[in-house]
Amino acid sequence: MLHEPRFWSAVAFVLFFVLFGKKLWTPLAAALDSRADRIRADLDEAARLRREAEQMLEDATRERETAMVEARALVEHSLIEAARIADEARREAEAVATRREQMARDRIAASERSAVREVRQVAIDVAIQATRDVLATALPAGADHAIVDRAIADLPSALSHRAA
């Protein structure tokens, strides 16, 4: 056993750790503790980042749902507004068509009245001319004074009948 290299290696190993173990163990433990602290800090940071990401995901989901609700409401409002505008445009078009139709009827009525006046005036002119022609050919030369005198005499009674 004293001549075994394994025995002496084990003794050297134990002596090495007995003599230098405390001095070697402290920095080694400090390095391992420091690494463990860094890993723990990294894990804490990763957990914090995960919580932030989950919170951001919840916020984004909530905002998306809110935006969808607002978009639906906006589309619904737009459809209602479009229907209202179309209805208003239809009513305005009907009102314009009615006004134009009434204006056309008024123009037609005015044209009819004007045509009737013109026809009456032409009829009166023709009747007057025919009367002149008939009177000029049928009446003797002295009869015109007697007719005018009789018309002047009948004038007050004709005016009184007309006023009543």
Swiss-Prot record:
Family named by the database record: Belongs to the ATPase B chain family.
Record-linked InterPro entries: ATP_synth_b/b'su_bac/chlpt, ATP_synthase_B_chain
Keywords: ATP synthesis, Cell inner membrane, Cell membrane, CF(0), Hydrogen ion transport, Ion transport, Membrane, Transmembrane, Transmembrane helix, Transport
Protein name: ATP synthase subunit b
Record membrane topology: Single-pass membrane protein
Membrane-crossing segments per the record: 10-32
Its job: F(1)F(0) ATP synthase produces ATP from ADP in the presence of a proton or sodium gradient. F-type ATPases consist of two structural domains, F(1) containing the extramembraneous catalytic core and F(0) containing the membrane proton channel, linked together by a central stalk and a peripheral stalk. During catalysis, ATP synthesis in the catalytic domain of F(1) is coupled via a rotary mechanism of the central stalk subunits to proton translocation.
Location of the protein in the cell: Cell inner membrane
Source domain of life: Bacteria
GO cellular component, one term: plasma membrane
Assembly, per entry: F-type ATPases have 2 components, F(1) - the catalytic core - and F(0) - the membrane proton channel. F(1) has five subunits: alpha(3), beta(3), gamma(1), delta(1), epsilon(1). F(0) has three main subunits: a(1), b(2) and c(10-14). The alpha and beta chains form an alternating ring which encloses part of the gamma chain. F(1) is attached to F(0) by a central stalk formed by the gamma and epsilon chains, while a peripheral stalk is formed by the delta and b chains.
Keyword Repressor (UniProt): no
UniProt key word GTP-binding: no
Gene Ontology molecular-function annotations: proton-transporting ATP synthase activity, rotational mechanism; proton-transporting ATPase activity, rotational mechanism
